Structures are given as structure tokens and as C-alpha cells.
From Swiss-Prot:
UniProt record, GO biological process: phenylalanyl-tRNA aminoacylation
Annotated localization: Cytoplasm
Catalysed conversion reaction: tRNA(Phe) + L-phenylalanine + ATP = L-phenylalanyl-tRNA(Phe) + AMP + diphosphate + H(+)
Name the record gives this protein: Phenylalanine--tRNA ligase alpha subunit
UniProt-listed Enzyme Commission number(s): 6.1.1.20
Residues given in the record as Mg(2+) binding sites: E255
Keywords: Aminoacyl-tRNA synthetase, ATP-binding, Cytoplasm, Ligase, Magnesium, Metal-binding, Nucleotide-binding, Protein biosynthesis
Cofactor(s) listed: Mg(2+)
Molecular function in Gene Ontology: ATP binding; catalytic activity, acting on a protein; magnesium ion binding; phenylalanine-tRNA ligase activity; transferase activity; tRNA binding
Entry's cofactor comment: Binds 2 magnesium ions per tetramer.
Source organism per UniProt: Lysinibacillus sphaericus (strain C3-41)
Record's subunit section: Tetramer of two alpha and two beta subunits.
């Protein structure tokens, strides 16, 4: 049995030495020291030996097992160190390589249009005013000369939350709130923000869109002041060569009311698909603040006057950037948005 032990030990040590990986080394351990390994079998067979042989053979078998175990652990440490070194070498980083540029985004076209309009009016002495998107019926309609039952309310199908609360259909309530708070003082504001209407979404309509309204109130404010303001806006957004025209219209909160058109920037008036062969493009609605609106806010229409206008940000962006479907602005499609990187100022 001693010869058998020496032979097993030599075989085990040789295979340990030949093992090139931790996996191979573990296979050697299982083969010789596992539950079914020969060294384990020898230990199990100790009971068959005589009382005189058992102590001597027990010591020999334990010595062989301890020696093989020690060599296994030593070899495992060497292989683990080699594996770590190999992994570090494969994952090394060349710090002299140039860094990879991070892909950065850019401003959304609607944001850019709104900021451009805000910058223009701030430069003209206007302030930016904001108000709640969930609004009272009074400020959304009644304070703007739209009492309950007024037929013009049907023009703006609304999202009502309760009988007296709704999602605002325009940013005009901000104007009504500002007039009420100013208590007869002069006003020069623009009111950008989201508005909501019960429209069916299509290429030119959305149930939610961005609107920018303007309001000026003071002494001797005339229609000529409104025209000059709108002319400045048109030239800023669509080019210095643009001309404007004002057409009579109707809005309950202004009197007189007008629609503003600009000369077509694509065909120069010759007629094209953008202007529908008219040479003019409709841009926005405006007018002089109705005396009833002034009175409800605490102003004396005999002493002060004012003008107001409303701009659809999507409308301006669609014309400015040649977008044919309003829904593109809301899809977060990078294929659409990335093209505006080239036009970033």
C-alpha cells in the first residue's frame, strides 16, 4: 500500500504541475481528493487493516493528502495571479488616446422660437407673465368679455374639470389676472405657455400647443402702435423684407379685431403652396382691448386703451423651419430634431 500511495502522490503532483488553468487544477483536485478519489478511498479502507498497520498507514495517507492539498493551493495561487494579470492586460486603457466626444443635444425648435420671441419683446421693454394652466372659467372666459352662453365659446371646445374649472384654452387669462393685479397701472407683457383645446390631432391641429400672447395698456395706445409692434415681430421672425397686412376679424375680447398676414417668404408674392397662391400667409390674431375687458379689470376705457395679440408658437415654427406636420414637434424623434442642429445659432 505504501508503493501505491507514493505512486498516487507522484501522479497527483505531476498533474498539478501540468494544470494550465484553474479549471484544470480543480479537475485534478476532484480526481484525487474528491469523494470518489483514490486517496479518499484509501482513507475509507483503513478499517480493514490490522490494529498494528492502521496507525502507520493512517499517518502515511494523511501526509500524502496534506502534501497534495498544499501543492494544489500553491498552484491555485499562481494561476489566480496569472489570471488577474491577464485580465488587467486585456482591460488596460491607453490614457494618451484622445477622448470620445459626448453627443450633446440642442434646443427644441419650439423652445428656440419662444426664446427668440421673448428676447425680442424683452428688448422692447416687455415683461414675461405666467399663470395657471388649470384655470377658473371666470378668467378664461367671463373676464375676457365671454359670459356664460356667449356663442363664441363654441369656437374653443374646452377640457372642463368641473363646472367652474378647466384647462385654459389660451393664455389670455394671464392678461386678465395681470390687469386685475395691476389695479389701473400701465402694462406691457407677453404670456407664453401651454394651452388646451378639444381638437382632433392632425397635421395642423393638436389638443395641446404653445401660445404667446401680448398685452399693452396705457394712455394713448393706438392701432398704429399695434401695427408697428407686429411689423417688428414679422421682420424679426421671417426677414427684414417682409411686409404685413391687417384684415378685419372678430374676437370677443378686442374691438376692432384684426388678422395679420405676412408677404410670402417663399415665393415673394408670386404664389406658391405655402401661401396657397395668394402671396400672403396668415400669422396671428390681434386687436385693441375691448372696453368691457378694461372695465372688468378696473380700468377706465375713457382714460386708457390697449392692444393684444396671440401667437401660436407651433405655427411660427412650422413656417420658419418648413415643417409640414405639427405632430413632429411632440414625438421626440431624433431623426426630426437632429436636423435643427445645423440651424442652431
Amino acid at each position: 500500500m505504501e508503493e501505491q500511495l507514493k505512486q498516487l502522490e507522484q501522479e497527483a503532483l505531476a498533474k498539478i504541475e501540468a494544470a494550465a488553468s484553474l479549471k484544470e487544477l480543480n479537475e485534478v483536485r476532484v480526481a484525487y481528493l474528491g469523494k470518489k478519489g483514490p486517496i479518499t478511498d484509501l482513507l475509507k479502507g483503513m478499517g480493514k487493516l490490522s490494529a498494528e498497520e492502521r496507525p502507520k498507514m493512517g499517518a502515511l495517507v494523511n501526509n500524502v493528502r496534506e502534501n497534495v492539498t498544499a501543492v494544489l493551493e500553491s498552484k491555485a495561487a499562481v494561476l489566480e495571479e496569472a489570471a488577474i494579470a491577464e485580465k488587467l492586460a486585456s482591460e488596460s486603457i491607453d490614457v494618451t488616446l484622445p477622448g470620445r466626444a459626448i453627443k450633446v443635444g440642442n434646443r427644441h425648435p419650439l423652445t428656440r422660437v419662444i426664446e427668440e420671441i421673448e428676447d425680442l419683446f424683452i428688448g422692447m421693454g416687455y415683461e414675461i407673465a405666467e399663470g395657471p394652466e388649470v384655470e377658473k372659467d371666470y378668467y378664461n372666459f367671463e373676464a375676457l368679455n365671454l359670459p356664460k352662453g356667449h356663442p363664441a365659446r363654441d369656437m374653443q371646445d374646452s377640457f372642463y374639470i368641473s363646472e367652474e374649472i378647466l384647462l385654459r384654452t389660451h393664455t389670455s387669462p394671464v392678461q386678465a389676472r395681470t390687469m386685475e393685479a395691476k389695479k389701473g397701472e400701465s402694462i406691457r407683457i407677453i404670456c407664453p405657455g401651454k394651452v388646451f383645446r378639444r381638437d382632433n390631432d392632425d397635421a395642423t391641429h393638436s389638443h395641446q400647443f404653445m401660445q404667446i400672447e401680448g398685452l399693452v395698456i396705457g394712455e394713448n395706445i393706438r392701432m398704429s402702435d399695434l401695427k408697428g409692434t407686429l411689423d417688428t415681430l414679422a421682420k424679426k421672425m421671417f426677414g427684414a423684407e417682409r411686409e404685413i397686412r391687417l384684415r378685419p376679424s372678430f374676437f370677443p375680447f378686442t374691438e376692432p379685431s384684426v388678422e395679420m398676414d405676412i408677404s410670402c417668404f417663399k415665393c415673394g408674392g408670386a404664389g406658391c403652396n405655402v401661401c396657397k397662391s395668394t402671396g400672403w400667409i396668415e400669422i396671428l390674431g390681434a386687436g385693441m382691448v375691448h372696453p368691457n375687458v378694461l372695465e372688468m379689470a378696473g380700468y377706465d376705457p375713457k382714460k386708457v386703451s390697449g392692444f393684444a395679440f396671440g401667437i401660436g408658437a407651433e405655427r411660427i415654427a412650422m413656417l420658419k423651419y418648413g415643417v409640414d406636420d405639427i405632430r413632429h414637434f411632440y414625438t421626440s424623434d431624433t431623426r426630426f430634431l437632429s436636423q435643427f442642429e445645423r440651424t442652431e445659432a
